[in-house]
Each structure stands twice: as structure tokens, then as C-alpha cells.
Amino acid sequence: MTELSAFEILAKLVSYPTVSDRSNLELIDWVEKYLNSFDIKTFRKYSEDKSKASLFAHVGPPIEGGVVLSGHTDVVPVEGQDWSSNPWELT
């Protein structure tokens, strides 16, 4: 996979409608493939019903210490909100 700019990555991430009551697996698939294309090892932890997953990645040597970056993939529903632009596209 081609290396993307930070803007391109953000645009891709925002494009996934990972509303909290829906699956996030399409987004997880993309992030995992992107990381794996740079030989970054990943593993998933699935929800009980397998509709969602958390993705873990490890960069660098497996030594004690380091930095943990954490985030989430779910967003609040957009229905009924007065958006002036598409909420799934960067503006």
C-alpha cells in the first residue's frame, strides 16, 4: 500500500460511518491492512457478537516501557442533526 499523508489518512478514517450502534470492521480492516503494509504487526480483539473489534499494533522492538496511543472508532449518530456538509467528508 502506498504511504499516505496525514491528511489523506484522516480523510479515509472520517469516511467510515462507524456510528456506535453499527459495526466498525470495515474501518478496522483498512487500518490493519495499512499498518501491515509497513510490516507493523497487529492483532484484533472482537466484541462478543463479533460485529466490532479493537485493533492493537506494536511498532519497534518488544522491550519494556514505551508509549501507548489509544483512540476509538465509534461516533455519535448524525441523523436529526443540522449538518451543513457531509459528515463523512473532510471540509
For the regions a language model picked out, list residue spans one by one.
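Active-site metal-coordination/substrate-binding segment of hydrolases
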Residues: 68-91
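N-terminal, positively charged, Ser/Thr/Ala/Gly-biased leader segments
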Residues: 1-67
